[in-house]
Structures are given as structure tokens and as C-alpha cells.
Design a protein with these regions (language model features):
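Hydrophobic alpha-helical and helix-loop surface patches within well-folded domains
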Residues: 81, 111-285
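Hydrophobic helix-coil surface modules that form long, contiguous segments used
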Residues: 4-18, 23-179, 208
Length: 285
């Protein structure tokens, strides 16, 4: 898994420069069109950000099967990717990846790259279509034509046009992580807020929308799908470890204070806003 793997420019916006180093938590990047070439042993299957520009030279499930495959006679293949209008680029490679492509809403290609727990990774494919359909209807259309869900990384982490998810052994965990990380395609990658400065605006918003999506897609019919967020925030509020919601993500004194403030309190914020102004009005904001 290759993430945070290249020197990044500091973002400059109306607030000035944001030169915060990446310390394994939140990050903020510069909008750009990425052209990336990766030369790697021909046995490896690659997935990640961007559209593959030379699928008939690569194969590995990317090619048009109605056309001839023309691989170069070499030990390595050079993968050419183009990613328009994104602010990050991530990729993963493994010779044992299984690569499936499923058509999602609005003809978006959903790519799945995985090695183990095949039954669960097959099962998540239709649910991923359902999740993207829900997010499209609730938030707005996914702005790219491809999204990849890749078994790799550490836990689950969102990147431009893709997510990396470690597991798959437990389907509930795989579904929940997929729902949350896919939600980040809107709340952080499309919205492009400074998640390092305002982590609750991406983690909290993603937690809010993934709870709604899980309730609908899995037909759980919970009266309050945000109950766990309320319970988590209540424990933090009673712990005397809570810090101001404006605290920078890298400046929390306690990791639990960061996690609950960003994820749970952020979700509670939207749930409470919906209670105050109405769900219909919230959907329009």
C-alpha cells in the first residue's frame, strides 16, 4: 500500500499556508490533475487513484476483452494513470489481487481488489453499489467515474477515488468500514475542507452519513441510527477530557478526545442540526 508516498506541496488558501506535517492522522492537499506512471513487476495488480490510460498493455482485469491485449515483452509493466481534479494520489499493488469490476450508479466503475475472505468481498460489491446510490441521492452525484475498494493499508483510510481496507473476515466490519470510507468521497475529497484543522467536518460528517446509509441499505430500521455517537460523546463529556471542537487534529492531549470529538461529536452536530431545522432543510444545506 502506497499512501502519503510523495513530497506534497503545502496548501495555500484564504487563511494562508497550511504546512502541517502528516503524522498518521488527518491531511490537507492541493487540487491538481495527476499524471502518474508506475513501473512494477508484471505479475503485480495495481489499483488506486486515477483512470488507467493503457489498459490493453496492462490487462489484469482492466482491459477491454473485445480487443486484443498487447503486453510488452518485458519483466515490468508501466501503468499510466490520470486523475483529474483531485488532491491526493494513493495506490496498492499485489501479485495475488483478485480484481473485479462492477457497474455502479451513473455508470461509475466500482473496482474491488482483494486477496482473502473472498465470500465477504464478493458480498460487499452489491452493497457498495447500494451505498453509492444512497450517497448520490442524499448528498449529490459522485463526481468521478471510478471508485476502488482495495484490501490493504491499516484498518480503513480514505483517499482520492479509492479506499484501503485491511480486513474482510468480519462482514459487519467490512460493510461499516466501506460505508464510512466511501462517505469520505464526498465529505473531504469532494468538499475538500481542511480536515487537519477541522477533523469533525470530515470524520463527523462521514460518520453521520454512514450511519444513515447502513440503516437504509441493511434495512435495520433503527429509530435513531446515531445512538452510538450520542453515547460515545456523552462518555467523553463526562470524562473531563473533552477539548474545544476547534482544536487542531494534531493538538489534542488525548487520542480518545480527538476520536470522539471528530467522529461522534461531529455526527451528533448534524443530527442535532437536523432536529432543530428539520431533515428536509438539512438535506438542502
Amino acid at each position: 500500500s502506497m499512501t502519503q508516498w510523495y513530497p506534497k506541496l503545502a496548501e495555500y488558501d484564504f487563511e494562508g499556508w497550511h504546512p502541517n506535517p502528516y503524522i498518521g492522522r488527518e491531511f490537507h492537499g492541493v487540487w491538481s490533475d495527476y499524471t502518474v506512471s508506475l513501473s512494477i513487476d508484471k505479475s503485480y495488480v495495481v489499483g488506486g487513484t486515477g483512470y488507467l490510460q493503457n489498459p490493453q498493455e496492462i490487462g489484469h482485469g482492466y482491459e477491454n476483452t473485445e480487443k486484443s491485449l498487447k503486453r510488452p515483452d518485458s519483466k515490468k509493466l508501466t501503468w499510466l494513470f490520470y486523475a483529474p481534479n483531485v488532491h491526493d494520489f494513493a495506490w496498492a499493488a499485489d501479485p495475488d489481487f483478485i480484481h473485479d469490476i462492477v457497474e455502479g450508479p451513473n455508470s461509475v466503475e466500482l473496482h474491488f481488489l482483494y486477496k482473502t475472505h473472498v465470500e465477504n468481498w464478493k458480498k460487499i460489491q452489491q452493497h457498495s453499489v447500494d451505498l453509492m446510490t444512497f450517497f448520490n441521492n442524499k448528498i449529490g452525484p459522485y463526481p468521478w467515474k471510478q471508485y476502488s475498494i482495495i484490501q490493504g493499508g491499516d484498518g480503513g483510510m480514505e483517499y482520492a477515488m479509492c479506499t484501503l481496507i485491511t480486513g474482510g473476515e468480519n462482514y459487519g466490519s467490512l460493510f461499516g468500514t466501506t460505508a464510512h470510507e466511501m462517505g469520505h468521497a464526498w465529505f473531504q475529497h469532494a468538499l475538500a475542507n481542511n480536515e487537519a484543522k477541522h477533523p469533525w467536518m470530515d470524520e463527523g460528517f462521514a460518520s453521520y452519513i454512514d450511519a444513515m446509509a447502513e440503516n437504509v441499505v441493511l434495512k435495520k430500521n433503527k429509530k435513531n441510527p446515531f445512538l452510538r455517537s450520542y453515547q460515545s460523546y456523552r462518555r467523553l463529556a463526562n470524562s473531563k477530557m473533552e477539548q474545544p471542537q476547534t482544536t487542531h487534529s494534531d493538538r489534542y492531549s488525548f487520542n480518545v478526545a480527538y476520536s470522539v470529538s471528530a467522529y461522534s461529536k461531529g455526527a451528533v452536530f448534524l443530527a442535532q442540526l437536523g432536529y432543530l431545522i428539520g431533515e428536509e432543510a438539512l438535506d438542502k444545506t
